[in-house]
From Swiss-Prot:
Pathway, per record: Porphyrin-containing compound metabolism; protoporphyrin-IX biosynthesis; 5-aminolevulinate from L-glutamyl-tRNA(Glu): step 1/2
EC number: 1.2.1.70
Name by which UniProt lists this protein: Glutamyl-tRNA reductase
Catalytic activity: (S)-4-amino-5-oxopentanoate + tRNA(Glu) + NADP(+) = L-glutamyl-tRNA(Glu) + NADPH + H(+)
Lineage: Bacteria, Pseudomonadati, Myxococcota, Myxococcia, Myxococcales
Protein task: Catalyzes the NADPH-dependent reduction of glutamyl-tRNA(Glu) to glutamate 1-semialdehyde (GSA).
The UniProt record lists the keyword Transmembrane helix: no
Enzyme kind, highest EC tier: oxidoreductase
One Pfam family in the UniProt entry: GlutR_dimer
Annotated site, Important for activity, chain positions: H94
PROSITE patterns registered for this protein in UniProt: GLUTR
Binding site for NADP(+): G184, A185, G186, E187, M188, G189
Active site: C48
Length: 441
């Protein structure tokens, strides 16, 4: 079994491509169930800045073909041109770095770990995250906790929502006296509301399709909740609008926002879209009085602040390397131990048989002490013969080496003949590979 990662992110793909693969949760589950046909395991990670599929599979080439087919169907051929791929230990390193927010647009942001955990839980619920992938994710979460504890990267970091509010403050030279609107009461909306309040916004409105969620958030931050049906009226009165909903189509278009212009009498409107797919149609930004930004624009804004966190990121990178090495070694031990156990059982059975044959041939000419000495000699020979292969398997470091040695031992000593025969008789659950042109990276 080998880990594969195929995906795209803000580093490789524009927002127009990423939002095509931003699936609602129900569709993510459908994809997982198609990909995770036993014995393949699958994880689908989707955030505003990345879409990645992780696969643990005995046939890496077959699993890769299936994933590429899904990504092509969902995102079109153009999406394939922006993909990156990692395999084996490199895929593990990438998973750990993503969970630790070392590959995020905003280095060190805390939200990504929660998003990966949600993907993990969704995968478990779909029966797609099992065994090795479950252990890899658990190790990545443990690594992220260690990074948060042992480095200052989280304390030094900002978030997408904080960056959006900083940009709004820069545009208006502060938010004192400004009316702000938060559209969406999820995690990103909650962060935006808190930062807007801290930045000194005079009036804070929160709206959400489910009014009770808007009311709960407004109560926490000292704002006012309004029904979603009042959305455009709220925008008409606002100076700043921050959007982060799960809508699959834009909430704001050039037509419905443009219709508000006459009543505003030229008063500028700052709109920032933290959603993927976007809540704000890009054409809205062509209105003279609207300053519209999306997540890619926020990336440019936060790039200047990344240097302050670079040193902590280096420390975190060392911890990631340590934790990946630990996981790889533990996995090699897990996979090597059954072979060692069968090898020892085989050797001990042979030793017992030969000792009994020898004792039988010698008959009654041996006393008890001599018989025990011969039995001890048989055990000692087994222990000495198996010491070196046992130590070698347990000391193995690089991923794949443990599998190679264990497989060689199993084949040389005929330890897996029964299992191989059973597996050969079992029908394949995977279809023939689909040829997909992968394009550039």
């Amino acid at each position: 079994m080998e880990l594969i990662c195929i995906g795209l992110s803000h580093r490789t793909a524009p927002l127009t491509v990423r939002e095509r693969l931003a699936l609602p949760e129900s569709r993510q589950v459908d994809v997982l169930q198609r990909l995770a046909q036993a014995p393949v395991e699958a994880l689908w990670v989707s955030t505003c800045n990345r879409v990645e599929v992780y696969l643990f599979a005995p046939d890496a080439a077959m699993a890769r073909q299936r994933a590429l087919m899904e990504l092509q169907v969902l995102g079109g051929v153009e999406a394939l041109e922006h993909l990156y791929e990692h395999q084996g230990e490199a895929a593990l390193v990438h998973l750990f770095r993503v969970a630790c927010s070392l590959d995020s647009m905003v280095l060190g942001e805390a939200q990504i770990l929660g998003q990966v955990k949600e993907a993990f839980e969704r995968g478990q619920g779909a029966g797609a995250v099992r065994g090795e992938l479950m252990r890899a994710c658990a190790a990545a979460f443990s690594c992220a906790k260690r990074v948060r504890t042992e480095t200052a990267i989280g304390r030094a970091a900002t978030s997408m929502a904080a960056a959006a509010v900083q940009l709004a403050s820069k545009v208006f030279d502060g938010l004192a006296g400004k009316t702000v609107l938060v559209v969406g009461a999820g995690e990103m909306g909650e962060l935006a509301a808190r930062h807007l309040k801290q930045a000194g916004a005079s009036k804070l409105y929160v709206t959400n399709r489910t009014l009770s969620r808007a009311e709960a958030l407004a109560a926490e931050v000292g704002g006012q909740a309004r029904p979603f049906e009042e959305l455009l009226g709220l925008v008409a009165a606002a100076d700043v609008v921050v959007c982060s909903t799960a809508s699959q189509a834009p909430l704001f278009t050039r037509d419905n926002v443009g219709a508000l212009g006459r009543g505003r009498r030229g008063r500028p409107l700052f709109m920032v879209d933290l959603a993927v797919p976007r809540d704000i149609d890009p054409a809205v930004g062509t209105l003279d009085w609207v300053h519209a930004y999306d997540v890619d624009d926020i990336q440019k804004f936060v790039a200047d602040n990344a240097a302050a966190r670079a040193e902590e990121a280096q420390k975190a990178g060392v911890l990631v390397a340590q934790e990946v090495a630990r996981f790889v070694k533990e996995r090699a031990l897990r996979e090597g131990t059954p072979v060692l156990a069968r090898l020892r059982q085989r050797a001990e059975a042979i030793a017992r048989s030969e000792v009994e044959r020898t004792l039988g041939a010698l008959g009654d000419g041996l006393n008890e002490k001599q018989r025990k000495s011969i039995e001890a000699m048989g055990r000692a020979i087994v222990n000495k013969l198996l010491h070196e292969p046992t130590a070698r398997l347990r000391a193995v470091g690089p991923e794949g080496e443990g599998n190679r040695l264990a497989g060689a031992a199993a084949e040389l000593f005929g330890l897996l003949e029964e299992e191989v025969g059973t597996a050969a008789a079992a029908p394949s659950v995977m279809a023939a590979p689909v040829q997909v042109a992968t394009g550039g990276k």
